[in-house]
Amino acid sequence: GLTAADKTLIKSIWGKVEKETEAIGVEALVRLFKCFPQSKVYFDHFTDLSPSSQKLHAHAKVVLGALTKAVNHLDNITDTLHDISLVHAKKLLVDPVNFELLGHCLEVALAAHFATDFTPEVHLAIDKFLYEVEKALFETYR
């Protein structure tokens, strides 16, 4: 789980992330599609997956908005993300491995945007946070 120190580091970096959520989200999604093209199958209704795509920008806001909610509820990530998990598991039928892949892409985007602030300690805390998010999203797949 997340330690008190992890939570402090996560909230600190996320204060900076919130000022650039759309750009970071778009960068992470574009990287996901380039590095893991199989993930595009869930976005076949998007005619444009380029960084300028309005639909991609909108989805980036939704994804980062959900992560912001999780940051604001670090002691209860599973309940916080329950509805999102349910939609992805039962309606959209997303292979849950994609959450982990997007997490990796998000970590790269954070490191690129916040090179000075993304210390090894922050990286570890964010990695642990994203693991908790992934576990929460996996919850309704059972």
Curated annotation (Swiss-Prot):
Entry similarity comment: Belongs to the globin family.
Source organism per UniProt: Latimeria chalumnae (Coelacanth)
Cellular component, GO, one term: haptoglobin-hemoglobin complex
Quaternary structure and partners: Heterotetramer of two alpha chains and two beta chains (an easy dimerization is also reported).
Domain (Globin): residue spans on this chain: 1-142
Tissue-wise expression: Red blood cells.
Protein's recorded name: Hemoglobin subunit alpha
GO terms assigned for molecular function: haptoglobin binding; heme binding; metal ion binding; organic acid binding; oxygen binding; oxygen carrier activity; peroxidase activity
Annotated heme b binding sites: H88
Function as written in the Swiss-Prot or TrEMBL entry: Involved in oxygen transport from the lung to the various peripheral tissues.
